[in-house]
From Swiss-Prot:
Stated name of the protein: Ribosomal RNA large subunit methyltransferase H
GO cellular component, one term: cytoplasm
Any one GO molecular-function label of the UniProt entry: rRNA (pseudouridine-N3-)-methyltransferase activity
Keywords attached to this entry: Cytoplasm, Methyltransferase, rRNA processing, S-adenosyl-L-methionine, Transferase
Keyword Cell cycle: no
Catalysed reaction equations from the record: pseudouridine(1915) in 23S rRNA + S-adenosyl-L-methionine = N(3)-methylpseudouridine(1915) in 23S rRNA + S-adenosyl-L-homocysteine + H(+)
Family assignment from sequence similarity: Belongs to the RNA methyltransferase RlmH family.
Catalytic activity, EC: 2.1.1.177
Binding site for S-adenosyl-L-methionine: L76, G108, L127, G128, K129, L130, T131, W132
Pfam families: SPOUT_MTase
Native species: Agrobacterium fabrum (strain C58 / ATCC 33970)
Known partners and oligomeric status: Homodimer.
The organism's place on the tree of life at top rank: Bacteria
Amino acid sequence: MRISIFAVGRLKSGPEKDLAARYIERLAKTGPAIGLEFSRVIEVGESRASNAETRKREEAAMLEKHLADGAVLVLLDERGKALDSPAFASLFGDLRDSGKRDLVIAIGGADGLDSALYDKATAVLNLGKLTWPHQIVRILIAEQLYRAVTILSGHPYHRV
């Protein structure tokens, strides 16, 4: 199963981008052995519309252009379901085992995600009750994807 991260906003050069890239590189090296291949990061620009609803709609349209037919869409949103790392890994393992070819994890802009994306989503997850800057969310999801691969492969990176 190919895994992609779609994000509203561009991650500028710096330590956040470097750390996210480090976890993505680890994921890309270890995932294929268990059927999880990192595909790509798609970044779309933030809308400049004057109101939040229009911005969310425009950003969703930009993200949807890159969404393959039949892709499983997982949204990251503060109102989503909280999972621990083993449950997160299990979700992806189950999707892989069910024959899904493409998985997209979407990170919204400052205003969140448009309802059109919620209608297409298989799951909506949160990264806890705290509010995180988008740069940190990118690091957190990259690390959790790598952690999920290590859990599914029995690697000792994740310890309970």
